[in-house]
Amino acid sequence: MAPMGIRLSPLGIGVFCLLALGVLYHVYSGFLTGRFAAFLLGDRAGDTVDLRELLAVSVRAAELGGVEVKKVRESNSLNEKAKGKTREGEDEKMTSGDVLSNKKMYHLIKNAFPAVLVNTEEQVDPDEEDAVSWDHDIPDEIKDKIKTSKPVSSESITIWIDPLDATHEYAENLVKYVTTMVCVAVNGKPVIGVIHKPFTGYTAWAMVDEGANIKKRSSYNEKTPTFIVSRSHSGEVKEVTRQTFGNKTEIISAGGAGYKVLSLLDVTADEQEKADVYIHVTYIKKWDICAGNAILNALGGHMTTLKGEEISYTGSEQNEGGLLASIGMDHSALVGKLAEKISVNAKKPAK
């Protein structure tokens, strides 16, 4: 008698082989996809970052940068030079304060979180090293507001550093306008903002949906708002805003995007002018505005282009659409009143 067993037909064997090949293909192709993604992302692949820790590092970075900024200014060793031209044809200034602050801020963040992408105003030699390190201390002020860790994937993060905001005013010794800033964007949205004033030691920080050490003011003037604007743009803004809101509309001319954002908030313990709306009518770099955008978002405010568009903090360093920032106001109404009159100037040189 022939032994009993299972006999497969040639068709059955063929089907089995095809199924096995299909399984192997999916397993192996998934493996290759993962390896390829890791190759593209380098050290960033698969890492997670705690946003609470990153906030603590960002605050420390802004403070360390501020130490360098203040030291250079007080020693009068600016070594001022032009690093290029602005679109308006003016020299774009750089000082030792910019360079030394940039070095400290960049390396502190990269040494603490090597997997994150950092965009900074001044060039950094990737082979240059700095021993500055984070001590892993999270200040009680942050732990009181943000109780637990907030992990996100490192590849979703873009950090924007401004090592010295208001360089022009810094060179003129108008130091009240000077700030150092750090912003953390997650998938292009500003989530963490830090603005530090080196010459007073004041620091504002916020994390969207989590907490802040600063708040909005108790009231704002929507009928005849006070506008704050760059010192070189006050003439054209004054004309448009007074046509829209009346001759009693006040214009504050000031330096520094960080200073202007703080003017919208409750900064009672520091020398700070107060405004209701911040307008910028030409293009502006994202490291100038990201930190302020994050803080305003965390407090329920808004920062958009002059057309009311949200600003994405990925890709290009430039924001071409001008700027409108407010809090405690009807932002959409402001956009509606001002967009048609000002947006046409967004790419024109400042007067």
From Swiss-Prot:
It is an enzyme of class 3 (hydrolase). Mg(2+) 2 binds at D162, D165, D288. The keyword Transmembrane helix applies. Its EC number is 3.1.3.25. The chain crosses the membrane at residues 11-31. It catalyses: a myo-inositol phosphate + H2O = myo-inositol + phosphate. Pathway: Polyol metabolism; myo-inositol biosynthesis; myo-inositol from D-glucose 6-phosphate: step 2/2. The keyword Membrane applies. Its cofactor is Mg(2+). It is found in: Membrane. Pfam families: Inositol_P. It is a single-pass membrane protein. It comes from the Eukaryota. PANTHER family: 3'(2'),5'-BISPHOSPHATE NUCLEOTIDASE 1 (PTHR43028), INOSITOL MONOPHOSPHATASE 3 (PTHR43028:SF4). Belongs to the inositol monophosphatase superfamily. This is Inositol monophosphatase 3. It comes from Xenopus laevis (African clawed frog). The lineage of its organism: Eukaryota, Metazoa, Chordata, Craniata, Vertebrata.
